[in-house]
Amino acid sequence: MSRQSLTKAHAKITELSWEPTFATPATRFGTDYTFEKAPKKDPLKQIMRSYFPMEEEKDNRVYGAMDGAIRGNMFRQVQQRWLEWQKLFLSIIPFPEISAARAMPMAIDAVPNPEIHNGLAVQMIDEVRHSTIQMNLKKLYMNNYIDPAGFDMTEKAFANNYAGTIGRQFGEGFITGDAITAANIYLTVVAETAFTNTLFVAMPDEAAANGDYLLPTVFHSVQSDESRHISNGYSILLMALADERNRPLLERDLRYAWWNNHCVVDAAIGTFIEYGTKDRRKDRESYAEMWRRWIYDDYYRSYLIPLEKYGLTIPHDLVEEAWKRIVDKGYVHEVARFFATGWPVNYWRIDAMTDKDFEWFEHKYPGWYSKYGKWWEEYNRLAYPGRNKPIAFEEVGYQYPHRCWTCMVPALIREDMVVEKVDDQWRTYCSETCYWTDAVAFRGEYQGRPTPNMGRLTGFREWETLHHGKDLADIVSDLGYVRDDGKTLVGQPHLDLDDPKKLWTLDDVRGNTFQSPNVLLNEMSDAEREAHVAAYRAGKTVPA
């Protein structure tokens, strides 16, 4: 189709739009933004006639690669360490995709621009396609991998797991609160424009290095759609910028969206890339190096900073703090240690680090061994049942962390933890920005302006609170993380399946009572709480 005929077809579509003049339409998805002065253009002029043949070709390539992987015995070559982490990743990622599809009607309803409505409808179809091919990838892994346990329960496990629910919070951010905040700034302007770079470009590169060429095929197919989504987001952003009343809301939402994306995506993808790989070539990029290239240079410097010419205040301080957390404060390494601590309630197995891993981490992050090496040696020592408890219940110099109320990633950079009483409850936050998000941004008023559409961060947000005072064996059983024999745990702190005596069972973990740090915090006196928080921030090992 020529560009001229495409433009004519697009113009015809906009002629079919209808705006009633005799009544005010009912608002289905509310927003506090205003668009009376907004320009109404769609720079890409997206239409279905050119869209479907392109997507059909992409799907053919994806399913052809899946067939080729089976015929080519890919699963004899792929690293187990890598595929185990895919049990968690592929249980989470289809949910944000389908949430993004659900977000498109919110954006269509909130944005009075017939031109861009068609592009948003196309994006909705994209997101459904993405979720579908990711679910099919997960099914193929389950059917062909040596240990399907975990892959076969991901939809259930994702919703009740201490790690999966972090991803659920992330995806629900696309469809809750103010329609523009959720469906445009949080989803499109930040998540899709920035963090899909590490998610769908850097991570597939790591997959290929571990013998998995299916994930790169699927996720490059996904990423190739993102340019259109970025265009949709930028168009709506420019519409919002046309009205000065929207500027404070945009600046609020950029701070919230950037920080929550960093907290969740960097925690997950950084861990998958750095602790899920067996490729320890010294010239291989660390996650910090990937982040500097794909997020700092490609997004922050080329996309965010130019927005200053429109009068927006860009969250430079939060970008620099995110970089500092990754490079100087060990954010990804803390997340990996937290996931490994929780192995009994995982539905994936976490491989121990070896001397080769230690050497690579020390090369990329000088000082890594002095902070994390001893703990991973303890993880290796406590890998098998019979002589010890799971590592979370052994004295190894590690205190189980408090959960952040906002992003739901624990307060792992302990010196930065914030403790405040909000809505008559003592809450813990991983950072000042997460506290601000809960106490200031998600409220009915912002800087003296009513913001009734923002909503609140409510519900049972702390996984630990749901299981406070329960025996570990009962928690695992209630979650359903037990293999077909009715006793062996799905999660294991090693990859050795050959010897049944090395596999942990419900009996091996029974007798360990789980305590929620946040429940205990609310039960403390003021003096006890102050002492506990001070010790936590200082990194001292004290009872939760």
Where are these regions (language model features)?
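Carboxylate/His-rich catalytic cores and anion/metal-binding grooves
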Residues: 124-152
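Long, repeat-rich segments with strong aromatic
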Residues: 197, 201-276
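Short metal-coordination and nucleic-acid-contact micro-motifs, chiefly zinc-binding Cys/His arrays
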Residues: 397-403, 423-426
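Short cysteine-rich clusters marking metal-coordination/redox-active sites
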Residues: 404-407, 430
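Zinc-coordinating Cys/His ligand positions in small cysteine/histidine-rich zinc-finger domains
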Residues: 412, 430-431
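Short cysteine/histidine-rich zinc-coordinating motifs and their immediately flanking basic loops
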Residues: 415-423, 441-448
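Short metal-binding segments enriched for Cys and/or His
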Residues: 432-452
